[in-house]
């Protein structure tokens, strides 16, 4: 997607980019318990510090939601990608981190499978090599991607509760899973 849409003539305003997630974090932070508020501040602070030092992180169209449930496989062959609702112009590294966090994670422990992650990155780089700055920031993007989906799930849960939506027809993914992933990813931070 990153290379194929490089010269795509249509535009879409940035949607759910980092500024959007900062706003969501600001809105949700008062509702978090003290430990979660500290965790959120930690990941945002690390992200701001590292991205200031490593600015060469290319942007373009990204899927923004490339989880297993948005792909179609026949055996080991990818046949289709679904759900382009979140298609956005953002940093490619977010798409890479989102994909690594789902496809290369051992659930339910949320440990990143290093062998799978390395295989993914090697294959990706045959199509689009990562910049030195992208490589330097990959760990914080893994954490930040987990934080974005933690925030999204908290936001959805909050809206469902406010609007009284309950029952089997409501898809509500567990925010705790992404929080656990965030904690796990922060363990690898070398900053």
Give the positions of each predicted feature.
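Hydrophobic core segments within long, regular secondary-structure runs in both alpha-
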Residues: 44, 117-121, 176-179, 183
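Active-site activation/catalytic loop segments of kinase-like enzymes and analogous catalytic loops
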Residues: 93-129, 144-161
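ATP/Mg2+ or Mg2+-diphosphate-binding catalytic cores
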Residues: 27, 149-191
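A structural signal for short hydrophobic/aromatic patches embedded in well-ordered alpha helices
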Residues: 40, 120, 137-138
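All-alpha amphipathic helical-bundle segments outside canonical DNA-binding/catalytic cores
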Residues: 130-142
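Active-site acidic catalytic loop and adjacent metal/ATP-binding pocket
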Residues: 48-94
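Short acidic/histidine-centered micro-motifs embedded in hydrophobic/aromatic stretches
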Residues: 17-20, 43, 141
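A cross-family kinase active-site recognition segment
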Residues: 1-37, 57-59, 89
């Amino acid at each position: 997607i990153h290379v194929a849409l490089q010269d795509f003539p249509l535009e879409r305003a940035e949607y759910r980019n980092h500024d959007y997630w900062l706003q969501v974090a600001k809105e949700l932070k008062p509702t978090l318990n003290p430990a979660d508020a500290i965790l959120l501040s930690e990941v945002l602070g690390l992200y701001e510090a590292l991205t200031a030092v490593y600015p060469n992180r290319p942007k373009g169209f990204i899927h923004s939601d490339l989880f297993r449930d948005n792909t179609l496989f026949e055996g080991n062959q990818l046949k289709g990608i679904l759900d382009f609702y979140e298609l956005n112009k953002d940093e490619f590294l977010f798409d890479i981190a989102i994909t690594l966090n789902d496809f290369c994670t051992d659930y339910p422990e949320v440990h990143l499978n290093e062998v799978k992650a390395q295989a993914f990155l090697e294959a990706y780089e045959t199509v689009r090599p990562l910049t030195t700055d992208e490589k330097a920031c990959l760990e914080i993007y893994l954490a930040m991607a987990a934080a974005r989906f933690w925030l999204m799930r908290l936001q959805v849960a909050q809206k469902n509760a406010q609007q009284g939506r309950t029952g089997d027809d409501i898809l509500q993914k567990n925010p705790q899973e992404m929080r656990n992933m965030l904690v796990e990813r922060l363990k690898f931070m070398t900053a």
